[in-house]
Curated annotation (Swiss-Prot):
Reaction catalysis annotation: Endonucleolytic cleavage of DNA to give specific double-stranded fragments with terminal 5'-phosphates
Keyword Hydrolase part of the UniProt annotation: yes
Signal sequence segment: none
Domain of life: Bacteria
Coiled-coil regions, chain positions: none
Similarity comment: family membership: Belongs to the BsuBI/PstI type II restriction endonuclease family.
Organism field: Arthrospira platensis (strain NIES-39 / UTEX 3086 / IAM M-135)
Activity regulation text: Activated by K(+) and Na(+) ions, whereas NH(4)(+) ions appear to inhibit endonuclease activity.
Cofactors: Mg(2+)
One Gene Ontology term from the biological process aspect of the record: DNA restriction-modification system
Gene Ontology MF terms: DNA binding; magnesium ion binding; type II site-specific deoxyribonuclease activity
E.C. code: 3.1.21.4
Protein name: Type II restriction enzyme AplI
EC class (word): hydrolase
Amino acid sequence: MSSNNPTPNLEQLMLEARQLMKDLGLPDKMQGDTPIFVLLVMLDMKPAKSWSEANNQKWGITPLMNKMRELGFKNLAPNTRENIRDDCVGQLVDAELATENPDKPRPKNSPKYCYQINQEVLYLVKKIGSADYPIALNNFLSNYQTIKHKYQAKRQSQRLNVKIAHNFSVSIAPGGQGVLIKSVLQDFCKYFNIDKVLYIDNTVDTARGYSPFIDENLINYLGIDIDKFKNSYDKPDIVLYKSDNKYLIIIEAVKTGGAINVERRDRLLSLFENVDVKLSFVNAFESFKELKRLTKEITRETHAWIMEFPDHMIHFNGDQYLFH
């Protein structure tokens, strides 16, 4: 790959970026126009800019899409956001060419969730079009497995591992609700003698991917409509089952908002229609300060649990107490 033009036009940039994708062994689907535009934006490249001027600033998906339009790629409807995230940026992360949230862990729904091209890739990119590129490419490919291991180890170290059954653990995604969810699974379950975990929203089961934990056998045993549950956008953060008195405990891990109000409670109830067990709704908070701030959102016939005081429960439904 070489170029005598230090300030390439857009067509030339795309051609050279596509060649980079090929050189790095990325699949054909990552060599189309959309992934190429994603890569150019993440490298802060545009016409009349030399590859040596590339950088690897952090990008959120929405700002990235806005920049793509500005660069000239107009065919981006708002509903393509997930495709950009999963099929383009996500593929770069899977290949260890980019990193999610390099500065600190964040929950998936954080508006500050971001991605960054890895430093080793940036070093290679800066050599595109120069006589040093073949050597830089060879060095990168020779060290690729070491590079992959480094970033995989970093992600693994950030995960929050918690045992939810005998000899069975799950990894909770770091950041945001992660610490609170881990505390619910460890402390709440301990103090209130909860013996089964039916569902956890924020778990990790691949090198990168976020995939909910779900006990399908328990769902079927309780008579929950599994297809309706899986396909619903209204699933809670955690669902527990207390088998000694047949209580299904639906928990929201509340950070900046999202406490169970009247509307939210009704939507959650619809997921468990015709289930022959008692239901209990719990808002989980990290601190009493957070509970106080959001108290007005919380509807009756729910409860509040605070991570700071794990053996206590606050009831928002008069004389009806949890699990009795």
